[in-house]
């Protein structure tokens, strides 16, 4: 199984989930249009929720999710030119908070229709809001049966301070 540690025998088939996903969980799921692909996104909508983006702000059940600008990072674009990108902290109704990136104001995903999450489905969004294939677009609602598991650790991050060649620094860069 490609979700196992190396050299471990496949002990389970299908998903392993101890409890239902909650808002703010980062989960791995099978891409609904092509279940051979695994995606990883954040759960923002639960069954029955109404989700909408208005002027770059996330609304859940007509309530704006608190969003605070906390700074900027330099982010290289596709031409490798570094440019400042705004970083925000969002706090979901259950108290889970996380950082999101806003690459540009008025991007295509900043204003959406209202999505009503069907029973046994979830609404997923990426934290890089302007550069994420998520439930606002081609991913759509994610059926519970497509969930693989919760992501609990970032093992290799391109945002980390260690180069892939600096193996000795990897343990201090795991987050």
Please provide the spans of the model-predicted regions.
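Soluble "head" domains of membrane/secretory-pathway proteins
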Residues: 1-175
């Amino acid at each position: 199984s490609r979700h196992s540690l190396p050299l471990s025998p496949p002990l389970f088939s299908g998903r392993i989930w101890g409890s239902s996903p909650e808002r703010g969980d980062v989960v791995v799921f099978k891409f609904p249009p092509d279940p051979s692909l695994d995606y990883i996104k954040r759960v923002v909508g639960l069954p029955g929720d109404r989700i909408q983006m208005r002027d770059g702000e996330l609304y859940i059940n007509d309530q704006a999710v608190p969003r605070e600008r906390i700074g900027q990072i330099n982010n290289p674009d596709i031409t490798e030119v570094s440019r400042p990108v705004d970083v925000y902290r969002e706090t979901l109704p259950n108290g889970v908070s996380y950082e999101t990136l806003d690459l540009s104001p008025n991007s295509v995903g900043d204003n959406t229709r209202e999505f009503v999450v069907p029973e046994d489905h979830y609404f997923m969004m990426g934290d890089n809001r302007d550069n994420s294939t998520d439930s606002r677009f081609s991913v759509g609602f994610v059926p519970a049966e497509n969930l693989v598991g919760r992501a609990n650790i970032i093992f290799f991050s391109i945002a980390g301070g260690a180069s892939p060649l600096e193996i000795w620094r990897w343990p201090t860069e795991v987050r």
